[in-house]
Amino acid sequence: MSEFQLVTRFEPAGDQPEAIRQLVEGIDAGLAHQTLLGVTGSGKTFSIANVISQIKRPTLVLAPNKTLAAQLYGEFKAFFPNNAVEYFVSYYDYYQPEAYVPSSDTFIEKDASINDHIEQMRLSATKALLERKDAIIVTTVSCIYGLGSPETYLRMVMHIDRGDKLDQRALLRRLADLQYTRNDMDFARATFRVRGDVIDIYPAESDLEAIRVELFDDEVESLSAFDPLTGEVIRKLPRFTFYPKSHYVTPRETLIEAMENIKVELQERLEYLRSQNKLVEAQRLEQRTRFDLEMMLELGYCNGIENYSRYLSGRPSGAPPPTLFDYLPPDALLVIDESHVSVPQVGAMYKGDRSRKETLVEYGFRLPSALDNRPMRFDEWEAISPQTIFVSATPGNYEAEHAGRIVEQVVRPTGLVDPQIEIRPALTQVDDLLSEIHKRAALEERVLVTTLTKRMSEDLTDYLSDHGVRVRYLHSDIDTVERVEIIRDLRLGTFDVLVGINLLREGLDMPEVSLVAILDADKEGFLRSDRSLIQTIGRAARNLNGRAILYADRITGSMERAIGETERRREKQIAFNLEHGITPKGVFKDVADIMEGATVPGSRSKKRKGMAKAAEENARYENELRSPSEINKRIRQLEEKMYQLARDLEFEAAAQMRDEIGKLRERLLAV
């Protein structure tokens, strides 16, 4: 049985011990679904970490977005430093899928920018699932999208043992089959170099170590892991397994067989299009498909090879695609964080993808089999999902219908109770809000304000600013990195008030916020549903003086339900505190970027002395970098400098550069 070593100085408290006991009991009893109804600040992640350490099963943690995934990755990495905590999210910094707009006869080519570091982390995640039982994978909805099948992927792996009989040329051919490239000058991920009988291989899934294979005649004399930057040998190895550069690597015989099937489908489709007098579409399809076949024959892959995934994986028409779920062992556990958001996301992916692909097929840009390159449908996801724990402060209808058990975690370990709720008239909401802000600012506390529209948030920000309030606003036009920095500045006290619309909700951890003001709370709709109201009110639940003000001229059904649920929780929390003699304590957390919480593989713990000048230069750049493209550009510049310094044998300076690259990659995690 795998050992999960939970490292923490905290003991479960409040409702946590009972919640952990019930969840473990439910899993052991074979319950397919359970819900952890945990209020904001009750330590849901800590409870789940305790459950994982007790049941000792590989776990997939599904988060609704990259920001929360990065936060969870950092927390689990801290809880389980000796286990395989991995990160599996979309590796696209930018993605424009191919599409056709018939009304204007416009074809949009697929355009994408792949983040090399995230790709490495994805490969590391699947390797951990295949090799280890103590794996925790933090992921987003990208886990339901097609991935190379685990059977094909495993057929391509290469095992090398010390003492093996191995011809050097055969080894190099096998590396080429894994899509590794030879590069004797620039040693990077998924490359190898040859120096006499010594072959250095940089594994595709590694960011820390390369492998040195030393041959004596046709025998593997030595295997060792070494630092690819300094060349320092880290340890000797008895054996090592090399995985392909990509999840989509296909054995040559499978590729040839797939190409024959593609030709058969192409012929059938061309006959159909010509019978419908769609000659332009037929000519277009034939030209594009034959070009792809030529590329596959010569190179082993082509651009858009995922559109032929049905043949490459040997699936029948309409079968679900292989995904990350296929890499999970049968006894795995699925934890869905903020399930009221994550579960609907899973259901929404299929339809949007389908409508775009149907247009491409109809107008001759793709074969009908391209429709099978898709995310899983919701029913397919339900069928393949292992035992599941839904985690949310406001579970949705799906969780309510499916959960075999609902476990409440309402009492916080700190003794903090849910905020008091006041209802005030909407007619004078702005002036009343201004006076409340001045009271909080005088106490050095922060305020969150939610509005209904982007225009209103900007106008309110201008109004408050004109009246001497230090204020910023937050909405969807602001990119993820800047969004995190704004939240960080609020916590640091750079400003006192943050105005937003729908972004001030799930997962935001801001203990300094003592007041949440909800404007126009009586406008029924998505932004003022009972779940939205409870989530927004919860942002003040980490502060000892937490309070929520709802500005409304009438009490809606959603308000009534939200207030009723909050009062129910308050009563339970206060009763628990009285019974156990607990005095509520405020939460104090170090102010750090969410991304800094995610310790990325590659950021070393060794403290390096090194070029002060380079450090100053990089610190100056760091404040200027905002968008993912700027950060990626900076990473590429630093990597070039780093490799040049390594070639010049200036290893201290190169290590300094590497540490800077590690910090920048952490910032990219949540983008």
From Swiss-Prot:
Record key words, sorted: ATP-binding, Cytoplasm, DNA damage, DNA excision, DNA repair, Excision nuclease, Nucleotide-binding, SOS response
GO molecular function annotations of the record: ATP binding; ATP hydrolysis activity; DNA binding; excinuclease ABC activity
Disordered as annotated region, ranges: 601-624
One GO CC term, this protein: cytoplasm
Residue numbers covered by motif Beta-hairpin: 91-114
Biased composition (Basic and acidic residues): 614-624
Family: Belongs to the UvrB family.
Known role: The UvrABC repair system catalyzes the recognition and processing of DNA lesions. A damage recognition complex composed of 2 UvrA and 2 UvrB subunits scans DNA for abnormalities. Upon binding of the UvrA(2)B(2) complex to a putative damaged site, the DNA wraps around one UvrB monomer. DNA wrap is dependent on ATP binding by UvrB and probably causes local melting of the DNA helix, facilitating insertion of UvrB beta-hairpin between the DNA strands. Then UvrB probes one DNA strand for the presence of a lesion.
Quaternary structure and partners: Forms a heterotetramer with UvrA during the search for lesions. Interacts with UvrC in an incision complex.
Protein name, per record: UvrABC system protein B
Record organism: Pseudomonas syringae pv. syringae (strain B728a)
Lineage, highest ranks first: Bacteria, Pseudomonadati, Pseudomonadota, Gammaproteobacteria, Pseudomonadales
Gene: uvrB
